[in-house]
């Protein structure tokens, strides 16, 4: 058997520095020096460009989100201002309606009271007048209590129209 001869034939990598050819080592080192930086450089450059692109995209989205937030804040403040104005207007209108209703109720009570004095059934008329007054006051109080929660523009206009029609009928 010739085992030492078998080990020296064929392709193999000899890592013993003293037994290898210095020229082979120089070719390998030059190849690594020449091609490895270009290969790694291209990979790193592509990765860097990808990261920069993602950062720019994220900055653009942040800018858009910031602009949308500012617009939403502006819209909210305008809506709050408009709601405050509507509430103030509805309170003014409800107060004027209440005052007008009270005035009409007082005038009506005075008329009823005057006719009750001259009439035989003045006691019954006074009781009815008192009940009407209390009913009107209770209805006005109840309406005023529930008015801010339910009163929008169209409902308010309908209420004013109904009140005027009711007063004109009486």
UniProtKB/Swiss-Prot annotation:
TM spans (from-to): 22-41
Principal location listed in the UniProt entry: membrane
Subcellular location(s) per record: Cellular thylakoid membrane
Keywords: ATP synthesis, CF(0), Hydrogen ion transport, Ion transport, Membrane, Thylakoid, Transmembrane, Transmembrane helix, Transport
GO molecular function terms listed in the Swiss-Prot or TrEMBL record: proton-transporting ATP synthase activity, rotational mechanism
Signal peptide, first to last residue: none
Glycoprotein in keyword set: no
GO CC, one annotated term: proton-transporting ATP synthase complex
Annotated membrane topology: Single-pass membrane protein
Function field: F(1)F(0) ATP synthase produces ATP from ADP in the presence of a proton or sodium gradient. F-type ATPases consist of two structural domains, F(1) containing the extramembraneous catalytic core and F(0) containing the membrane proton channel, linked together by a central stalk and a peripheral stalk. During catalysis, ATP synthesis in the catalytic domain of F(1) is coupled via a rotary mechanism of the central stalk subunits to proton translocation.
UniProt similarity note: Belongs to the ATPase B chain family.
Subunit and interaction comment: F-type ATPases have 2 components, F(1) - the catalytic core - and F(0) - the membrane proton channel. F(1) has five subunits: alpha(3), beta(3), gamma(1), delta(1), epsilon(1). F(0) has four main subunits: a(1), b(1), b'(1) and c(10-14). The alpha and beta chains form an alternating ring which encloses part of the gamma chain. F(1) is attached to F(0) by a central stalk formed by the gamma and epsilon chains, while a peripheral stalk is formed by the delta, b and b' chains.
Protein name: ATP synthase subunit b
Species name: Prochlorococcus marinus subsp. pastoris (strain CCMP1986 / NIES-2087 / MED4)
Gene: atpF
């Amino acid at each position: 058997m010739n085992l030492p001869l078998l080990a020296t034939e064929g392709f193999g990598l000899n890592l013993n520095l003293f037994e290898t050819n210095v020229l082979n080592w120089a070719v390998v080192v030059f190849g690594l020096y020449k091609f490895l930086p270009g290969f790694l450089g291209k990979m790193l450059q592509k990765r860097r460009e990808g990261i920069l692109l993602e950062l720019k995209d994220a900055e653009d989205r942040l800018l858009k989100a910031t602009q949308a937030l500012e617009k939403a804040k502006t819209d909210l403040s305008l809506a709050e201002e408009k709601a405050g104005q509507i509430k103030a207007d509805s309170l003014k209108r409800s107060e004027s309606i209440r005052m007008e209703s009270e005035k009409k109720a007082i005038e009506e009570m005075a008329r009823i009271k005057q006719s009750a004095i001259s009439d035989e059934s003045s006691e019954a008329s006074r009781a009815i007048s008192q009940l009407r007054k209390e009913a009107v006051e209770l209805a006005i109080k109840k309406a005023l209590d529930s008015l801010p929660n339910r009163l929008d523009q169209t409902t308010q206009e309908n209420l004013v129209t109904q009140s005027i029609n009711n007063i004109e009928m009486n």
